[in-house]
Amino acid sequence: MKYVTLLLQVGVLYVFSLVGTWIQGVFHLSMPGSLIGMLILFLLLSTRVLPLKWFELGAEKLIVFLPLFLIPSTTGLMEYGSFLFSKESIIFLLVVASTVVTLIVSGYISQLLITTKK
């Protein structure tokens, strides 16, 4: 039963992403659809239209894999190495700094969420 609940919760989170992508496509927004879906989910959770317990188990399992979601964006930059170094290395430094800040902030928020739950 636990696995079914986990699959349903992750599936519903994915549906929010799909709805956001659909809204982005219909209205031709420059904001990513997955971000729109997260904003919709945030609004529904913060107004208590949807209870947090409906997503808690699935979100906990996804947070465990959060660092793995950051790896493709970082390794994808290797394709543009010549471009990054051609602009007097300022772009390279900005990319490295933003990656480090993203890792630190996401790690801090993950730890904060884990400790506040306990």
From Swiss-Prot:
GO BP terms: namely: cytolysis; killing of cells of another organism; programmed cell death
One GO CC term, this protein = plasma membrane
Q: Where in the cell is it found?
A: Cell membrane
**Protein keywords:** Cell membrane, Cytolysis, Membrane, Transmembrane, Transmembrane helix
Transmembrane segment boundaries: 4-26, 33-52, 62-84, 91-113
Topology of this chain in the membrane: Multi-pass membrane protein
Q: Could you confirm whether the keyword Transmembrane helix appears in this record? A: yes
Similarity section? Belongs to the CidA/LrgA family. CidA subfamily.
Q: What does this protein do?
A: Increases the activity of extracellular murein hydrolases possibly by mediating their export via hole formation. Inhibited by the antiholin-like proteins LrgAB. In an unstressed cell, the LrgAB products probably inhibit the function of the CidA protein. When a cell is stressed by the addition of antibiotics or by other factors in the environment, CidA possibly oligomerizes within the bacterial cell membrane, creating lesions that disrupt the proton motive force, which in turn results in loss of cell viability.
Which protein, by its recorded name, is this?
Answer: Holin-like protein CidA 2
Organism of origin: Bacillus cereus (strain ATCC 14579 / DSM 31 / CCUG 7414 / JCM 2152 / NBRC 15305 / NCIMB 9373 / NCTC 2599 / NRRL B-3711)
